[in-house]
Amino acid sequence: MKICFVASECEPLVKVGGLGDVVQSLAKELVNLGHQVSVILPFYKSIKAQNVQFITQHTLNLGGVYYDFHIYKTNLDNVDIFLIDQKTFFGREYVYGTPKGPYEDNYLRFAFFSLASLETLSHVCHIPDIIHIHDWHTALVAVYKDLYFKHLDETATVLTIHNIAFQGIFLGHILPQIGIPWGLFNPEDLEFYNQVNFLKGGIVHSDVITTVSKTHAKEIQTNMGFGLEGVLREKRYVFGILNGIDTESWNPATDKSLYQNYDINTFKAGKEKNKMYVKELFGLETPHTRPLAAFIARLAKQKGLDLIEKAVDDAVKIGYDFIFLGSGDYYYQGKVLDMVKRNMGYVAARIEYNDILSRKLYAGADMFLMPSEYEPCGIGQMIAMRYGAIPIVHKTGGLADTVVDYNEDNEHGTGFSFEDYTYKDFLYTMARAMIVYQKKYIPEDNEWYNIVSNAMAQDFSWRRSVQEYIKIYKTAKLIKMH
């Protein structure tokens, strides 16, 4: 099949969140199976691609305004990457906005990108069997395709919702600026409480909808659909496919970032040495018997930082050390720094996104915190298990699908989870994990090590998930044929 991804992120060129990982990994796996895959991306200022080839220049009419743009091409892992270069929209320091908030003209930036992507795949790429769009940033591809690109009628559109909380909602008066007729401003289409909802438009106009875990596919059709549950329930084809991780890249046996490599047979010594190294790196001089809990994520309310902030002082008292790594909202950056000040010597933080440091931390941590309020899929808990850091998670979305709660009756557990999103439930679960962890220092007691072995043995590669996507693509093509 010929498949064209249209996305706002793709590792390693541009990554803000998990979307970049998914697009890169899925495209790579599809190519390995013999499919012809291309990816269309904005050519952000931050992209430092090598071997970039200029292809052509185009002019686009968007709402009566003409925009010139250039199309460039590169290739990564046998995937053709087409970069749309338009300096007004993408020649900025950040991808979506500054730390103070999103860019005010994001509606125009991503409407332009969606329309320019269709022009690109019409004139530069081979016309694909499938256009696979991702989140609200490219949801208008489905709308514009139905409106203006009749020669693509036989091409099916698949929309993956990675995070339904972000929908691209803007004031209704923008419609003329983005070249969409007022006839689509109705409750059956883009209108959403008298505003324009890009993601809703993508849902209505796409042939198949996917999201990133089976549990989350059910959740978004309930009151966890952020207002779009009714639209989703009306769609016949809504599927949940669990994301995978690139197990070649995320491999503690070969990861060059680690102080010492290890695998499922050598993790006892390997993780101990990495823990000593990472504690020294972050300036923690506490006894080595204290468990080290790591938080590696975007600093945002969704990620459960309110729960952690309430529980951290008590958790330190019962014997935990903490390391935070991530960037995000100024408010939560402040919260993290407050936790460090209150528990100096037991809690450390780096306010940055740093891939190499994150790898060191996965390897050195005993536990990995992901008490997310909601989590469509989550990649962090999969990487953590791969590196033998035991996840402590809220039982929601993809966390419910990937982490098996450990208890005395379930020897196959891979982590610890809690049902109610309260700090008391979270702290109780941390205490449960602590009790089992302390047994590692009892001779002949292998309970903790068994959990680590279970976690490291999990297969979170893309091999299984990519087969499900291929089935979805075939379903979408069949819908188009009928």
Swiss-Prot record:
Single biological process term from Gene Ontology: glycogen biosynthetic process
Pathway the protein contributes to: Glycan biosynthesis; glycogen biosynthesis
InterPro entries (UniProt xref): Glyco_trans_1, GS/SS, Starch_synth_cat_dom
Protein origin, superkingdom: Bacteria
SUPFAM superfamilies referenced in this protein's UniProt entry, alphabetically: UDP-Glycosyltransferase/glycogen phosphorylase (SSF53756)
Substrates-to-products reaction catalysed: [(1->4)-alpha-D-glucosyl](n) + ADP-alpha-D-glucose = [(1->4)-alpha-D-glucosyl](n+1) + ADP + H(+)
The protein's name: Glycogen synthase
Organism, scientific name: Hydrogenobaculum sp. (strain Y04AAS1)
